[in-house]
Design a protein with these regions (language model features):
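Short catalytic micro-motifs in class I SAM-dependent methyltransferases
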Residues: 111-112
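Conserved class I S-adenosyl-L-methionine
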Residues: 1-38
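A short glycine-rich, Lys/Arg-flanked "PGG" loop and its adjoining helix->strand segment in the class I
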Residues: 122-134
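Class I SAM-dependent methyltransferase SAM/SAH-binding core
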Residues: 44, 48-96
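C-terminal alpha-helical "lid/dimerization" subdomain adjacent to the S-adenosyl-L-methionine
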Residues: 141-189
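Conserved Class I S-adenosyl-L-methionine
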Residues: 50, 174-211
């Protein structure tokens, strides 16, 4: 996973500019909701990638600590030259967030949740919530399943995860975890950690928000 996204870093943001009016409208809605809900917050961003979402949330957040494991994507994120008083880009492991030395009252992770192996979800969420204060606002967004986009969804025997093959321009191919969820599944996953849980299942993307218990 890290190798794929590191090698794809320079073209990663192309996924946000597909000429699909429904897709574009939903992306705008996600941006607007993030900016509204995280306004004035000290925010943790998990798997920030190239800083695409960071640049919008920084418009209203008090400060963002944006974490990613890949040096390559962080280099591109830093090229956006966001104010250091507003954003700190940090190389870090999303599965070891409990090692952070500060806490936050807001957090988000966009287009990361689908890449978490299902057997690691609870561990990730436990460590994620360790660094969030009670009442913190959390937002997440990810893809709805569309069989016409992204190639064949691969299932394996005795494996609850699903996978897709991703190809780069130079011909390299990578098999990555890509899991999709129903509203009922998302409810069951997040309810133990959440109050005021809101789940929106749209055409292209799902979006959730909640307050930390």
């Amino acid at each position: 996973m890290k190798t794929y996204y590191s090698n794809r870093a320079r073209i990663y943001e192309e996924v946000y500019f597909r000429e699909d009016p429904i897709r574009q409208a939903e992306l705008i809605e996600i941006k607007d909701v993030l900016k509204e809900k995280l306004a004035g917050k000290n925010v943790l961003e998990v798997a920030c990638g190239t800083g695409y979402w960071t640049q919008y949330v920084a418009e209203t957040a008090q400060h963002i600590t944006a974490i990613d494991y890949s040096e390559e994507v962080l280099t591109i994120a830093k090229e956006k030259q966001l104010l250091s008083s507003k954003v700190s880009f940090v190389q870090g492991n999303a599965y070891k967030l409990n090692q952070l030395t500060k806490t936050f009252d807001g957090a988000y992770a966009n287009f990361w949740f689908s890449h978490i192996p299902k057997e690691n979800i609870f561990s990730f969420l436990e460590k994620f919530h360790v660094v969030l204060e009670k009442g913190s606002i959390v937002c997440m967004a990810d893809n709805m399943y569309n069989e016409e986009i992204g190639g064949t969804l691969i299932s394996k025997i005795n494996d609850e995860n699903t996978y897709k093959i991703r190809s780069l321009a130079d011909g390299q191919q990578y098999e990555i975890i890509k899991n999709y969820y129903s509203k009922e599944e998302l409810t069951a996953i997040f309810e133990p950690f959440a109050t005021d849980l809101e789940i929106h299942m749209n055409t292209c993307f799902w979006f959730i928000s909640y307050k930390v218990k």
